[in-house]
């Protein structure tokens, strides 16, 4: 894999640190008044999910991680693994364990496309799209006189996630949810 110099560091770059693939979250170039310039890097270990910080002298180089982000369609779960299939027509399937899927489980819907990060052919992480459309399976009927301003109520979705929705939303309706914040965005027109 390619080597990256400190002047090529940017957020999102995948590098190898201590034998583990890591993703750079923040990169700050520091040039003190006296001494050599350096880069202060905040990174996330893609295997463990831990966040760390390290400094690199200006001009150092680091090996790039052999990590691939692929769009894959979620097929099903067998209780232990979550199965995904490549969307390029090859029908190649990968099984991701619970640690790779993480919090994405509450947004997993069959036949939807997710970004799966592979390292040496094994799934490291699964990222949902920014917005998903899910059906409400359970929510209380909203009574208009309950609040002085626009209120909200909890609603359980088909995936098991609970989202705060406005009072006018009813059971059985499809809604659009922001997966980054877990908030209701809008009603989906059918």
Curated annotation (Swiss-Prot):
One of its GO terms (molecular function) is translation elongation factor activity. It holds the Pfam family EFP_N. It comes from the Bacteria. GO terms for biological process: peptide biosynthetic process. InterPro entries: Elong-fact-P_C, NA-bd_OB-fold, Rib_uL2_dom2, Transl_elong_fac_P/YeiP, Transl_elong_KOW-like, Transl_elong_P/YeiP_cen, Transl_elong_P/YeiP_CS, Transl_elongation_fac_P. Transmembrane segments: none annotated. The modification N6-(3,6-diaminohexanoyl)-5-hydroxylysine is found at residue 34. The keyword Hydrolase does not apply. May be beta-lysylated on the epsilon-amino group of Lys-34 by the combined action of EpmA and EpmB, and then hydroxylated on the C5 position of the same residue by EpmC (if this protein is present). Lysylation is critical for the stimulatory effect of EF-P on peptide-bond formation. The lysylation moiety may extend toward the peptidyltransferase center and stabilize the terminal 3-CCA end of the tRNA. Hydroxylation of the C5 position on Lys-34 may allow additional potential stabilizing hydrogen-bond interactions with the P-tRNA. Keywords: Cytoplasm, Elongation factor, Hydroxylation, Protein biosynthesis. Pathway: Protein biosynthesis; polypeptide chain elongation. Belongs to the elongation factor P family. Involved in peptide bond synthesis. Alleviates ribosome stalling that occurs when 3 or more consecutive Pro residues or the sequence PPG is present in a protein, possibly by augmenting the peptidyl transferase activity of the ribosome. Modification of Lys-34 is required for alleviation. PANTHER family: ELONGATION FACTOR P, ELONGATION FACTOR P (EF-P) FAMILY PROTEIN. This is Elongation factor P. The gene is efp.
């Amino acid at each position: 894999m390619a080597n990256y110099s400190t002047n090529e560091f940017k957020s999102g770059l995948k590098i190898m640190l201590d034998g583990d693939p890591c993703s750079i979250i923040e990169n700050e170039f520091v040039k003190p008044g006296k001494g050599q310039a350096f880069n202060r890097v905040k990174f996330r270990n893609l295997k463990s999910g831990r966040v760390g910080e390290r400094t690199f002298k200006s001009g150092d180089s680091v090996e790039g991680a052999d990590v691939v982000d692929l769009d894959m369609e979620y097929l099903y779960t067998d209780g232990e693994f979550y199965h995904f299939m490549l969307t390029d027509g090859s029908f190649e399937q990968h099984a991701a364990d619970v640690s790779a899927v993480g919090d994405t489980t509450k947004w997993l819907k069959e036949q939807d496309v997710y970004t799966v990060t592979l390292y040496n052919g094994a799934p490291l992480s699964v990222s949902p799209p920014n917005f998903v459309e899910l059906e409400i399976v359970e929510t209380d009927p909203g009574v208009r006189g309950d609040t002085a301003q626009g209120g909200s109520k909890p609603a359980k979705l088909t995936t098991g996630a609970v989202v705060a929705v406005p009072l006018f939303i009813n059971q059985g309706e499809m809604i659009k949810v922001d997966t980054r914040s877990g908030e209701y965005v809008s009603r989906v027109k059918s």
